[in-house]
């Protein structure tokens, strides 16, 4: 079974496309959306989709994704089931779940993610994605926007995502490496470029570069203001 966990906060624009990309995949799967107190029409989007389970949790990706994992466990997720953490602005490719169903019978496959690119044709965003994919190939640390998947039993054993405001995916990825080497699948997830264009593409590029330097060389982390919400 694949449990898709989507943290949301004011994602009315991108969420319908993300949900569509999930519901077009072959079963079996369950979709759990964990909302952090949206003030837009995100909850209306959820109410229109009867195939989706949802709950509330304190705002913050770590808090919301951990809540989704607990929800899956309460719904009898087994240790070998996949937990797939999907950002609300990121769409799965066709064939994503076939890959996961294929890996399910391989006990050596414990975690992984997908290659990444942004929507649109902006060459600077393509460069960011290329750099990010290269980084992942070298470090084996899966970022949140790469649709991280991990066995439920291993996720629980590791204690879930660390409760911190930023870089929870990076820290979890480092912890994950102590137990397994995540697989980078050849399929590509697509993240809506709207937020990154609004933030400023060069700012986005610098942010990715600084995160890579933090991961690869242990440079200090950055203030939460640097990772402010852009809607």
Residue spans for each PLM region:
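A conserved acidic beta->alpha catalytic loop
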Residues: 35-43, 89-91
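Short beta-strand/loop segment that forms part of the nucleotide-sugar
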Residues: 6, 20, 28-37
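Acidic helix N-cap motif at the loop->helix transition within catalytic regions
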Residues: 13-17, 40-48, 95
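Conserved donor NDP-sugar-binding/catalytic core segment of glycosyltransferases
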Residues: 94-124
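Short aromatic/hydrophobic "clamp" motif used to bind/position activated sugar donors
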Residues: 83
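Short, well-formed alpha-helical segments that are part of the catalytic scaffolds
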Residues: 10-24
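Hydrophobic helical membrane-anchoring modules
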Residues: 174-231
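Conserved donor nucleotide-binding strand/loop of the catalytic core
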Residues: 43-71, 75
């Amino acid at each position: 079974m694949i449990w898709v966990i989507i943290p949301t906060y004011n994602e009315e624009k991108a969420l319908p496309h993300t949900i569509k990309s999930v519901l077009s995949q072959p079963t079996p799967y369950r979709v759990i959306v964990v909302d952090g107190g949206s003030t837009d029409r995100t909850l209306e989007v959820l109410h229109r989709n009867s195939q989706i389970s949802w709950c509330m949790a304190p705002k913050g990706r770590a808090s919301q994704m951990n809540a989704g994992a607990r929800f899956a466990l309460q719904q009898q997720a087994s240790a070998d089931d996949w937990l797939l953490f999907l950002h609300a602005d990121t769409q799965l490719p066709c064939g994503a779940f076939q890959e996961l169903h294929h890996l399910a019978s391989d006990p050596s496959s414990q975690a992984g993610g997908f290659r990444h690119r942004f929507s649109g044709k902006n060459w600077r965003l393509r460069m960011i994605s290329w750099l990010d994919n290269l980084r992942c190939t070298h470090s084996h640390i899966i970022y949140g926007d790469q649709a991280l998947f991990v066995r439920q039993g291993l996720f629980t054993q590791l204690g879930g995502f660390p409760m911190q405001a930023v870089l929870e995916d990076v820290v979890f990825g480092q912890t994950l490496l102590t137990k397994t080497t995540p697989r980078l699948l050849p399929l590509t997830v697509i993240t809506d470029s709207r937020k990154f264009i609004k933030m400023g593409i060069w700012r986005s590029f610098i942010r990715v570069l600084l995160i890579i330097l933090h991961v690869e060389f242990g440079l200090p982390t950055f203030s939460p203001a640097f990772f402010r919400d852009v809607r």
